[in-house]
Each structure stands twice: as structure tokens, then as C-alpha cells.
Design a protein with these regions (language model features):
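Active-site and donor-binding regions of nucleotide-sugar-utilizing enzymes
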Residues: 29-186
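Short hydrophobic helices that act as membrane-entry/anchoring signals
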Residues: 2-36
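Short intrinsically disordered, low-complexity coil segments enriched in acidic
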Residues: 1-3, 118-119
Length: 186
């Protein structure tokens, strides 16, 4: 019975979350365009954030490294995957992370085994487009940058997600499990 209750809580939360995203999208776009006045990269390739772009051949391993710090911790992982012959797409939310990724992997990008991309906005259609364009085998999420839309989209589209270099201390897990709704439910 508790599994059913948990699923209902997740469904209610996701409906509410998606509705909030829909309402807040103009604010999110305003934020990106405002930031782009000082850092033009925030608004560059904006369609990527909606999951729109050119479809790529083959399947890809997705590494989600939001910012510069996450990217730095992902470097050994990306290197090992490329050594094994995997094609890797790295997503970022911040221009600093993206710029560092593009610079560090310039040779791999030109050879076509690494791509750098903005992370899609956290709603299902954007992730559905993204997962479809790259035929994602699985996602490796650095640290604890899981988002509800990302998780539910990956689950709905059978894309396995793995947490890398992240911590969810027992104390936090226990505290969260006592709440009406927690990240544990998702």
C-alpha cells in the first residue's frame, strides 16, 4: 500500500511541478536573457535548452555536469569512457562549465566522440527530444544534480540514471523519509 501511496504522491508532485515550470518559463527566459547581457553565452544556442537541435548518429553516454566544479570531477570519467570507445555528451547549465568543457575536449569534439550541450529545461518534452536526438544509453549525473523532470523523463523513456560523486548522508535520508514528500519518493 505504501508503494501505491508513494506513486500517487509522486504523480501529484509532478503535475504541480510541471505546472509551476509552465508558469515560470517566461521568468526563466527573462533570467537567461538578462544574464546574457553580461555573459552572452547564457542565451547562446537557446534551442538546446528545449531539447531542439540536430539528431546525432549512434548512441551516446550522457554526463550531466551542471557547472565548472562538476565538470572538473567528471573529467576522469569522460576520459575513461572515450578510451573505451563511447561517444559522450556532456551537459551544463552554466557558461563556465560549458566553456571549460569545450576547451578541454576540443580535440575530442572535433573528432566527434564528445559533444557539449546545454542541459534541457526540466520538463518532459525537452528531455524526450534530447534523449531521442542522442539515443542516450544511460546518464551519469555528477554530484546531486538530479531534477524531478529529468528523473521522471528518464524513467518514462527507459534511460537509466546513475549518481556519480554524490552523497546522500544517512541523516538526510532519514529526515527526508519522514516528510510527506521527499526526493526518496521520486
Amino acid at each position: 500500500m505504501s508503494k501505491i501511496r508513494s506513486n500517487i504522491k509522486v504523480m501529484i508532485f509532478l503535475v504541480f511541478y510541471r505546472f509551476i515550470w509552465f508558469l515560470c518559463m517566461p521568468l526563466v527566459l527573462f533570467y537567461l536573457f538578462s544574464r546574457s547581457k553580461h555573459e552572452p553565452a547564457y542565451a547562446a544556442k537557446l534551442l538546446e535548452r528545449f531539447g531542439i537541435g540536430q539528431t546525432q548518429n549512434g548512441s551516446w553516454v550522457w554526463i550531466h555536469a551542471v557547472s565548472l566544479g562538476e565538470f572538473r570531477s567528471a573529467i576522469p570519467l569522460v576520459d575513461k569512457l572515450v578510451e573505451r570507445g563511447e561517444r559522450v555528451i556532456i551537459t551544463h547549465f552554466t557558461p563556465a562549465g560549458r566553456a571549460a568543457s569545450e576547451k578541454y575536449y576540443a580535440d575530442h569534439i572535433s573528432s566527434g566522440c564528445v559533444l557539449v550541450h546545454w542541459v534541457p529545461f526540466d520538463y518532459r518534452l525537452a528531455f524526450k527530444r534530447f534523449f531521442g536526438r542522442f539515443k542516450i544509453k544511460y546518464g551519469l549525473v555528477m554530484e546531486v544534480e538530479f531534477w524531478p523532470g529529468m528523473i521522471s523523463s528518464a524513467r518514462a523513456l527507459n534511460v537509466p540514471l546513475f549518481l556519480c560523486n554524490g552523497q546522500y548522508p544517512n541523516k538526510s535520508f532519514e529526515r527526508d523519509s519522514r516528510r510527506y514528500f521527499s526526493s526518496r519518493d521520486i
